[in-house]
Amino acid sequence: MNVMIKKISLITICIAVLAFAVFAAVETMTFSKTLKKEIDSKLFYETKKIANQMSMVFENAEGSVDTLCAEIEHNFDVHRQLQSPEYINSYMADYSPVIRDALADIEDSQGLYLTFSPDITDRNGAYEIWYSYDRNGELTYTDATSNGIYYESFEDESFPTMHYYFGAIANPGEGIWTEPYMDSDIGQEVIAYSRAVYSDGILIGVAGTDIYTEHTVRLINDMNTEHDGMIFLLNENNDLIIASDNAKRTDILDSTPLWRSVTKNTNGRD
């Protein structure tokens, strides 16, 4: 009888252990799924928050330039300019403070300008209104001829600093973003958003804003990510424009297969 009791007890213990193991496995799986769901949710939230932060920077730049273009189209008399080439001088004097004050109100933009088309000027001067922040953070009027080149650059569409101009002209009615390039007039690498301004089908010029690359990198590095997460700014082809410093310290940017894996199903921003 004692042997039978021992056998029953042993069987009972085995069943209890097995039941506990099954229960523990189910609980572990449930906890893992819950934990994964929480992690995925937090990662999605963090990613969306960072994307929204960067979107605000670019949308502010786009909105400011688009508004500026609408104002110029409305208040610049292109027909008067074609009849009296000196009209542009008085216009620049009157409108220069407007561009200066507009730049002061655009958060995270470091330059704002209106480049007039040479085709409506007498080419006797640099017809451009350009304000930018210098390295000391001072808002200053910027000389577009400081690198010794002005009208020559309008003859070469491949000139690095002129993509903002020719790219905008090639896309009438919409704004364009450039890839990062070195602007020799101010000694800064920038990305630019620009848009061509027309009146009665006549090109007045191109308005645009600059965001210094180092400023964008600083914005990206200042964004808090979980577990030292990496941030990338891509164009519509998933080509890298700017990356956070911790991403540059890895081999992710040099590994084509890894980069394709990272950018798979990702919509870049131009």
Regions found by a protein language model. Name each.
Residues G175-P180, T266-D270:
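PAS and PAS-like sensory modules
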Residues E214-D270:
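Intrinsic low-complexity, intrinsically disordered coil/linker regions enriched in small/polar
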Residues A102-E174, P180-G187, D239-R260:
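Extracellular/periplasmic ligand-sensing ectodomains of membrane signal-transduction proteins
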Residues P97-I106, G167, R218-M223, N265:
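Amphipathic alpha-helical regulatory segments at dimerization interfaces
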Residues E128, A192-Y193, D228-M230:
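Short loop/turn microsegments at loop-to-beta-strand junctions
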Residues I186-N224, E236, I242:
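Conserved beta-strands of PAS-like sensory domains
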Residues K6-T12, A19-A93, D101-A104, D108, ...:
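Juxtamembrane extracytoplasmic/periplasmic/luminal helical "stalk" adjacent to the first N-terminal
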